Amino acid sequence: MSVSMRDLDPAFQGAGQKAGIEIWRIENFIPTPIPKSSIGKFFTGDSYIVLKTTALKTGALRHDIHYWLGKDTSQDEAGTAAVKTVELDAALGGRAVQYREVQGHETEKFLSYFKPCIIPQEGGVASGFKHVVAEEHITRLFVCRGKHVVHVKEVPFARSSLNHDDIYILDTKSKIFQFNGSNSSIQERAKALEVVQYIKDTYHDGTCEVATVEDGKLMADADSGEFWGFFGGFAPLPRKTANDEDKTYNSDITRLFCVEKGQANPVEGDTLKREMLDTNKCYILDCGIEVFVWMGRTTSLDDRKIASKAAEEMIRSSERPKSQMIRIIEGFETVPFRSKFESWTQETNTTVSEDGRGRVAALLQRQGVNVRGLMKAAPPKEEPQVFIDCTGNLQVWRVNGQAKTLLQAADHSKFYSGDCYVFQYSYPGEEKEEVLIGTWFGKQSVEEERGSAVSMASKMVESMKFVPAQARIYEGKEPIQFFVIMQSFIVFKGGISSGYKKYIAEKEVDDDTYNENGVALFRIQGSGPENMQAIQVDPVAASLNSSYYYILHNDSSVFTWAGNLSTATDQELAERQLDLIKPNQQSRAQKEGSESEQFWELLGGKAEYSSQKLTKEPERDPHLFSCTFTKEVLKVTEIYNFTQDDLMTEDIFIIDCHSEIFVWVGQEVVPKNKLLALTIGEKFIEKDSLLEKLSPEAPIYVIMEGGEPSFFTRFFTSWDSSKSAMHGNSFQRKLKIVKNGGTPVADKPKRRTPASYGGRASVPDKSQQRSRSMSFSPDRVRVRGRSPAFNALAATFESQNARNLSTPPPVVRKLYPRSVTPDSSKFAPAPKSSAIASRSALFEKIPPQEPSIPKPVKASPKTPESPAPESNSKEQEEKKENDKEEGSMSSRIESLTIQEDAKEGVEDEEDLPAHPYDRLKTTSTDPVSDIDVTRREAYLSSEEFKEKFGMTKEAFYKLPKWKQNKFKMAVQLF
């Protein structure tokens, strides 16, 4: 559609350029912008245009346009608003969805912009009304309807307005009463309290009293007596009588009309199909309660205005005041519209393939052309933000039939594609220790063991009182949280579980389980040492990809293969994975285009292969749904512009961000549905409410109220954990907040979750724990290649057998400040004086240590201390002393870090005395004294150094520190 700027109203210039809400009021047929201070105020005699601009994850802006018609607005103003909305859409590029909003029948999406409610005021521009603050407060009665958003309507202040089904708010001069009809739900009552808070803040400066009255309690308390006194005393309420607002319209019958020359002509057809819509025309789809206007991409601005008028007339003539009109442009159809059609092929974004570039580059390289410039890969996409601490404790079990086997620490990250696993990960959260219990299903695993794994994980969660989060993960669909937990993750072909062995025996298929002496090919992927994977693939040339590094081995040879589009990071990860897959064999490097014959022989010869990097489902903008699950039927309702307050403790909610599904379960949900939370998540994927072709293997998380981890709360603009620490149902909690001036009051401290599952002890055995990498300060700059001295010190703080990585783990960003409650000081953990003192003493002397479980060291902001009584003065002195020691320890660590970073990469130029290898190695029975134990190799003679390391000292010190450490460990000099 080509549009001249002369056809567009100048009031819309520059509109929709940034996220937010913009509103115009129709004044003398001209859209006039209203100031930000007036956003949310509507007058019954006016018509408005509301533009909501949303910034999407893709960086694009989405526009939704609503035109709101007050109950007393004139037909001319309403018509102007409808036409100007079409012009605004044209000014924005013709992509916006347009909604007709009638006072009292607004869409939930529209009301979500103005939470908790809108209360239109009498008057308007046409009547010359000027808003003046009344000197005397007028007693008003409002009816509230809605479970997720609230429709508020002022009704006559009379007993006849009340009924048992709705909730009413009586706003008097000194007190606000909420009357809860006996047939209203807890959720509706809780939402109505948000309106009470709004009225209290807006019309009473937040100072008046609030009271609730329960329908049927007669004169049980003073508040009830006072409430009924305004109505002349108590009397039974009449039954609700049906009126025009309560009429329902058949939405099962849908009719399609084509608009030509201002007339809506029926389109014949038994079923609706996408092919019925012509891009050169406009159509009306009448669904009773909803009327859609579909406008082809090539239609003119006048055609669109005419179609909109025809739809308005259709609604008006059939007397359907509640019907909503939605106008959509071809290519930007909404989910409700597309769902009316039998088949609708949704356009997908095409990705540019790297195949052509890779093949041409490889051909040129074989012809002797320098392809260095051609081989530069496209800028890497930003790595997803990590929202989980990776310094926690991990336990992993392999499922064998109906039983599970605990894995040794060395095997925690080595999975088989034919097996299922259960894992438990305990880690420091923002306010308490958090636990994630999950299952991982290999692609070749059997259904029986998958069911066993889910049952085992669910029982673990249930035994811990539903505090941990639960995850269901499939091979190939792992989220970033899982990879960060596992760190060096390897997936082998085949399996060793009883279920897998039984399956291949019954099916009489070959067992391709990984054999370290056989031919195996691994694809290396990841973003760094804390997130790297080696995936075993078929040992054939077609499995190669120019964007990756590979490891290929048989019983006697090891090759690394570098694709032309791979990076230096990929090379580093391949070197690290070699340490795990083939630690004792020297590898031979192969570059794409210059491979040896032996390399191709192991792969069975050359073949065509891809060069396009494998991509995972991207995370999309989150959508929140409220769920009801009865008789195996799942019903969902989308909550727009959601906040934490939309989560009701009696209900189950789902956040859908396409790549992952989060099922949130309130504390007051019935026990039966708590146990079915994972099933509800699976049913949601099957339902595919957004028609986005959700993968049935998408990760599902089950999150219990009160145990929300950071990777869940990140979807909310703010999060207050004290709200879930309150007792009672949603209504009782909201009432406490309203009566407390809008501040949540925690009834009890959060329970600290146990560190592990099973047995009598809550702490796992050290032998079964994998030592984790750790970061000494969450605010430290990322340091590459820590030196042996620093690594040795870090190892002391973790455990004696700690595994050293070259980089600290990713820092988990604190999303929200800790919630402050009147009793928060009571919940703060006690200072670990003895631990700090003992660790500080390590700098002078390291005494023999008893076996202990490695615990993460995590810096946390200091909290103000409340003054203690005089009797505790001795304890205060001890605490001050310990704080000094802690500060000293931190400063020494930072100082050492700076010194070691400065030494990074410095060659050995000192004139040190030479000592024999037998006296320098760590296991020596006659060790040399007075040497730097972090540089034992420097005291070797040049000849013995070359014999042990296979290189000169000069070449050795040019290697990165992590590689130096690897060589030193191999010869017992580290």
Swiss-Prot record:
Keywords associated with the record: Actin capping, Actin-binding, Calcium, Cytoplasm, Cytoskeleton, Phosphoprotein, Repeat
Bias (Polar residues) ranges: 888-898
Record-annotated HP domain positions: 909-974
CDD domains: gelsolin_S1_like, gelsolin_S2_like, gelsolin_S3_like, gelsolin_S4_like, gelsolin_S5_like, gelsolin_S6_like
Disulfide bonds listed in the record: none
InterPro entries: ADF-H/Gelsolin-like_dom_sf, Gelsolin-like_dom, Villin/Gelsolin, Villin_headpiece, Villin_headpiece_dom_sf
Gene3D superfamilies: Severin, Villin headpiece domain
Start-end of Basic and acidic residues biased regions: 872-887, 912-921
Gelsolin-like repeat segments: 29-79, 150-190, 262-305, 394-451, 532-572, 634-675
Tissue specificity as recorded in UniProt: Preferentially expressed in vegetative tissues. Detected in the whole seedling, hypocotyl, cotyledon, primary root, roots hair cells and trichomes. Expressed in flowers but not in the silique.
Location of region: Disordered: 738-783, 801-833, 845-930
GO biological process: actin crosslink formation; actin filament capping; actin filament depolymerization; actin filament organization; actin filament severing; cytoplasmic streaming; root hair elongation
GO cellular component: cytoplasm; cytoskeleton; plasma membrane
Disruption phenotype: No changes in the primary root length, but shorter root hairs. Increased sensitivity to latrunculin B (LatB) and instability of actin filaments.
Biased composition (Low complexity): 824-833
GO molecular function, one term: mRNA binding
Cellular location(s): Cytoplasm, Cytoskeleton
Modified residues (Phosphoserine): S777, S787, S890
Function noted in UniProt: Binds actin and actin filament bundles in a Ca(2+)-insensitive manner, but caps the barbed end of actin filaments and is able to sever them in a calcium-dependent manner. Involved in root hair growth through regulating actin organization in a Ca(2+)-dependent manner.
Record-linked PANTHER family: VILLIN, VILLIN-4
Family in the record: Belongs to the villin/gelsolin family.
Name this protein carries in UniProt: Villin-4
